[in-house]
Amino acid sequence: MLQQRTIKTLTRAVGVGLHSGQRVELTLRPAQPDTGIVFRRVDLPEPVDIPITATAVVDTRMASTIGAGGAKVHTVEHLMSACAGLGLDNLYIDITAEEVPILDGSSASFVFLLQSAGVELQNAPKRFIRVKRPVEVREGTGQQLKWARLEPYHGFKLRFDIDFAHPAVDSTGQSAEFDLGEGNYARDIARARTFGFTKDVEMLRSSGLALGGGLDNAIVMDDYKVLNADGLRYDAEFARHKILDAMGDLYLVGKPLLAAYSAFRSGHAMNNLLLRELLAHEDAWEIVTFENERQAPAGFTQPVRAW
């Protein structure tokens, strides 16, 4: 039987929110089978649980925000991406503020925390959402066109194409692909950082966003080049970060997907719209388990190796 996974022991991190700039403490705790991933706002007078679901997403401006019972947690996508990459099904995430810490702008620190806590197999079948037919969402036309698509696939793979007219992006590639069954999430995707442009920072900060952003937790570019002294971590790091984000956004459906995802200029809003479009058509998906691990898709049977 392909089993569900949680972590063996609790682990903690402290950082600041990318947009809020607030100090935040994060505690990741093991959870029982079939719990799912649950964020808990422990800073409120009465703690509020926010289980992840596609419909728990309440805002997608600049990040994915989930909410329940009047409480919200912003910028969940990097931590959720790490959970997806490591195949974790059940986890409690206690948080002392309204935004997940940005740490280094990638999911690498979350991967390190979770792997350090250890991955524990649980006596319950791992449940997948298997996509049975193509589902697509589109927006705009011509140069404004953007789209995202899910198609049937015995595994989980992603392709993302971006379109930034910038020398640094052009020189490293505008597309990236990742197959969970062939690649290694920790090595190939997790270290890709969020990115932004200096010309946008003042506008964002005047709107109360990017207050915790800087060269230590993002790739920052002027009109011509990357400003970070250490340069880029990957070829096509920009497109790889979009894959990192998409993995986190898609994992908000609450179960791992068996599908091929492809997208052009998509973002948090379109990724969530794609999930809602999928769930709205019951003929497009089904819940499956694998009693025989040999029949399970590659990439889900063994814990992800470290770097």
From Swiss-Prot:
A molecular function GO annotation: metal ion binding
Annotated positions binding Zn(2+): 78, 241, 245
Keywords recorded for this protein, A-Z: Hydrolase, Lipid A biosynthesis, Lipid biosynthesis, Lipid metabolism, Metal-binding, Zinc
Catalytic activity: a UDP-3-O-[(3R)-3-hydroxyacyl]-N-acetyl-alpha-D-glucosamine + H2O = a UDP-3-O-[(3R)-3-hydroxyacyl]-alpha-D-glucosamine + acetate
Annotated EC: 3.5.1.108
InterPro entries xrefs: Ribosomal_Su5_D2-typ_SF (IPR020568), UDP-acyl_GlcNac_deAcase (IPR004463), UDP-acyl_GlcNac_deAcase_C (IPR011334), UDP-acyl_N-AcGlcN_deAcase_N (IPR015870)
Function noted in UniProt: Catalyzes the hydrolysis of UDP-3-O-myristoyl-N-acetylglucosamine to form UDP-3-O-myristoylglucosamine and acetate, the committed step in lipid A biosynthesis.
Entry's family note: Belongs to the LpxC family.
Protein name: UDP-3-O-acyl-N-acetylglucosamine deacetylase
Species name: Acidovorax ebreus (strain TPSY)
Gene name, Swiss-Prot/TrEMBL: lpxC
